[in-house]
């Protein structure tokens, strides 16, 4: 009954909140309610700007005093003062000072602020003014309030016994009262002393000093906090602090308290220099009191460094380095620098030199993986890559390329060998084409030399010290495009694009590269090779394995084709690709039957995209294993996009257990097929309400994998968001048949309107959350 009740309640809320006015832009609506400066802004020295005065009556007292009565208007540059009576006085002879005095009510306007109050003193030879008992509104942006005294200066405003809010008139959702307030105009921030924060007129907290942004400029200070409750974290509260160290250097520190785990400190530092930009991130928990994942209390931490630079015209430096304390880190802590479903994090750096015909790269690479294995992947340190390209040589008939690499492999395990690998790969391509099609004839040579060294462990396997491998390759690639304007669908043009490829590469036993006996605790072949994901596009790849340690023999024909449909505006609306490899001879790297291609043909592979209309898109992929006589892979996604970020996405993913197991190494098995059905939705229900929901169900386990519901209310001056999430997790010594969940509830509250650009609805941020974040997977738009 509870499930039905919540469903009906949710539908009721959706129906009640939905409005066609959601198409309007909230930011534009909010800015309609603020004053805007009329006319062109006048620049210049106030001493040199003329003063224009209009009034019903005027009384002159020599040349130092004048009194104007009745609908008095005083204009000077951008300033405009209106009142029932205004007096103009001039003081002094040399460097005389002129003042305008308004009493018993006035209105003042310039390009930055509008005020009305009781008394005003306007300095006509500068931008200064002194005002009593005023109501004010900022011009062109949200911000208003009251003050007993206001001092207007060229670069700042000082207000005594003042209030401030970004809410529009007739709304007092929140406000700040301060004994003294100083608004810095160019720096776009306000300082407040003895400040009281109120919600609907009710005092919430007091602080002796407060800084608040009133623009887009970066300022040091407290940012919006976040809070919530979780099964694993307990009650938690995160308070970010922003430090604007320099124009090109800033930092954000976020202490986070979790009642079940303790204090976590998160720090992010960004920098921008002449030779590059990047950031450092540290997440650190000294002692994790909640030890389900580790079975012991210990520190948990993350370090990230990302850097990109372009210097000395042709040089590039790139760093992408992430390291966590343990393999369960991303399962326990949500971070934008990794996800438990990725299975690994990168740790690599490279420096590269680019020229039109060649490039050189020196890099260091390794991965931190989260699989339950005792032996991790190899690190490549150093790795030197050189590429050379020269097209249209031999009178424009041939394209030449050369890839070469030198790399040293090392492993943390004493059981694993180390090695140097030297590789050179020249290729010649003969491109032939005419209006009927194109034929590319490519010849290539793989020449590799290994210098290997046995592992230092007592039980390390003996290994061949020197291995040489030379493999020639020839590939013929033919394709054509056949167009038919008389498609069976009226108004559409159909193309048929058949593709034929022949690939030949002789067999060479490569079992001496790396360990001869495959270690079940090591995921990979050789030093950096593993099976690549198979799909339609992989049918036309040269190699089945990543890296260079396993290059399979090939004597095969690949047949494939794509059909496309174009509308009358030449926009592609639908495509379908299908193909298969036919093996003329066994494809293998050694004599192990497990490392051979199964059967005389590969799986049938299909890929398709369909842009149904401007709002609906569909994508699907399918593989049928002719050896197992069953579906091995299937994916499909249907998405509805109405406007803005509004979307509904339905997805289904299937991976056959036999397909998984035949791609795993040694005695590792997955144990079941993957059958997963998912739904993601994000919707601006009205101008103010936003909803994001996500649900993934494992059909094999008959249990949900992840559930998420987030709803946010946005107004012109504040927003509040609530997110509820339930997802599958794990712990140390967990039984294979045991499914554990973490339940969490989060709350965010923000003050809006302080910056002209802070009216976003946070849909993108909510879609990124979770183990299975939203991915837009369409190629037709």
From Swiss-Prot:
GO terms for biological process: Gram-negative-bacterium-type cell outer membrane assembly; lipopolysaccharide transport. Keywords: Cell outer membrane, Membrane, Signal. The keyword Iron does not apply. It holds the Pfam family LptD. Residues 1-24 form the signal peptide. One of its GO terms (cellular component) is transporter complex. It is found in: Cell outer membrane. Disulfide bonds: none annotated. Together with LptE, is involved in the assembly of lipopolysaccharide (LPS) at the surface of the outer membrane. PANTHER family: LPS-ASSEMBLY PROTEIN (PTHR30189), LPS-ASSEMBLY PROTEIN LPTD (PTHR30189:SF1). HAMAP family: LPS_assembly_LptD. Component of the lipopolysaccharide transport and assembly complex. Interacts with LptE and LptA. Belongs to the LptD family. This is LPS-assembly protein LptD. It comes from Histophilus somni (strain 129Pt).
């Amino acid at each position: 009954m509870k499930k039905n009740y919540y469903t009906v309640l949710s539908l009721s809320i959706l129906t009640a909140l939905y409005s066609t006015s959601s198409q309007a832009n909230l930011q534009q609506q909010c800015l309609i309610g603020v004053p805007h400066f009329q006319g062109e802004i006048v620049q210049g020295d106030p001493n040199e700007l003329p003063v224009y005065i209009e009034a019903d009556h005027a009384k002159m007292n020599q040349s130092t005093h004048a009194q104007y009565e009745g609908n008095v208007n005083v204009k000077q540059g951008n300033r405009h003062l209106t009142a029932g009576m205004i007096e103009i006085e001039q003081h002094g002879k040399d460097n005389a000072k002129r003042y305008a005095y308004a009493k018993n009510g006035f209105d003042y306007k310039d390009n930055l602020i509008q005020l009305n109050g009781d008394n005003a003193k306007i300095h006509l030879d500068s931008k200064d003014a002194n005002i009593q008992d005023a109501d004010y509104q900022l011009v062109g942006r949200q911000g208003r309030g009251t003050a007993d005294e206001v001092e207007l200066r060229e670069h700042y405003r000082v207000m005594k016994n003042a209030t401030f809010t970004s809410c529009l008139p007739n709304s007092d959702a929140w406000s700040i009262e301060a004994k003294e307030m100083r608004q810095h105009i160019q720096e776009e921030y306000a300082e407040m002393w003895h400040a009281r924060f109120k919600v609907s007129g009710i005092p919430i907290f007091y602080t002796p000093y407060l800084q608040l942004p009133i623009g887009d400029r970066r300022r040091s200070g407290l940012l919006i906090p976040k809070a919530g409750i979780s099964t694993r974290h307990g009650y938690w509260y995160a308070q970010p602090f922003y430090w604007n160290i320099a124009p090109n250097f800033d930092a954000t520190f976020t202490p986070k308290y979790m009642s079940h785990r303790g204090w976590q400190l998160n720090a992010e530092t960004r920098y921008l220099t002449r030779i590059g930009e990047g950031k450092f991130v540290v997440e650190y928990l000294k002692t994790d009191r909640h030890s389900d994942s580790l079975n012991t209390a210990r520190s948990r931490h993350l370090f990230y460094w990302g850097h990109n630079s372009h210097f000395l015209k042709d040089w590039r430096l790139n760093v992408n380095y992430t390291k966590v304390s343990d393999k369960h880190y991303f399962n326990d802590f949500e971070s934008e620098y990794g996800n438990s479903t990725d299975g690994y994090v990168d740790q690599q750096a490279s420096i590269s030199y680019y020229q039109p015909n060649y490039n050189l790269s020196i890099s260091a690479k390794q991965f931190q993986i989260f699989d339950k294995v005792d032996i991790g992947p190899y690190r490549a340190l150093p790795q030197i890559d050189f590429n050379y390209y020269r097209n249209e040589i031999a009178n424009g008939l041939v394209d030449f390329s050369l890839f070469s690499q030198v790399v040293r492999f090392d492993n943390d395990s004493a059981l694993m060998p180390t090695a140097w690998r030297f590789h050179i790969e020249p290729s010649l391509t003969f491109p032939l084409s005419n209006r009927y099609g194109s034929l590319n004839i490519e010849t290539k040579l793989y020449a590799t030399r290994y210098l290997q060294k046995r592992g230092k462990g007592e039980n390390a396997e003996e290994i061949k010290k020197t291995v040489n491998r030379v493999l020639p390759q020839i590939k013929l690639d033919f394709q054509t495009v056949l167009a038919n304007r008389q498609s069976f669908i009226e108004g559409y043009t159909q193309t048929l694009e058949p593709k034929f490829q022949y690939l030949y590469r002789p067999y060479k036993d490569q079992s001496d590269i790396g360990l001869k006996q495959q270690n079940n605790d090591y995921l990979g072949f050789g030093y950096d090779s593993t099976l690549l994901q198979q799909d339609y596009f992989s049918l036309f790849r040269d190699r089945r394995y990543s890296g260079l340690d396993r290059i399979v023999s090939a004597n095969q024909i690949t047949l494939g084709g794509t059909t496309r449909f174009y509308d009358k505006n030449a926009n592609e609306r639908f495509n379908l690709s299908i193909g298969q490899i036919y093996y003329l001879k066994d494809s293998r790297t050694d004599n192990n039957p497990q490392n051979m291609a199964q059967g005389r043909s590969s799986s049938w592979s299909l890929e398709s995209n369909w842009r149904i209309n401007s709002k609906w898109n569909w994508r699907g992929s399918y593989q049928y294993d002719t050896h197992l006589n069953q579906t091995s892979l299937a994916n499909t996604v249907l998405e509805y996009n109405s406007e803005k970020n509004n979307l509904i996405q339905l997805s289904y993913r299937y991976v056959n257990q036999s397909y998984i197991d035949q791609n795993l190494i040694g005695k590792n098995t997955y144990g079941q097929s993957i059958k997963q059905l998912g739904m993601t939705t994000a919707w601006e229900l009205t101008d103010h309400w936003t909803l994001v929901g996500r649900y993934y169900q494992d059909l094999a386990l008959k249990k949900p994998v992840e559930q998420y519901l987030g709803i946010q209310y946005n107004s012109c001056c504040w927003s509040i968001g609530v997110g509820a999430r339930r997802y599958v997790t794990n712990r140390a010594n967990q039984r294979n048949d045991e499914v554990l969940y973490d339940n969490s509830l989060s709350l965010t509250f923000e003050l809006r309107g302080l910056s002209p650009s802070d009216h976003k609805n946070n849909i993108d941020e909510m879609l990124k959350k979770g183990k299975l974040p939203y991915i837009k997977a369409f190629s037709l738009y």
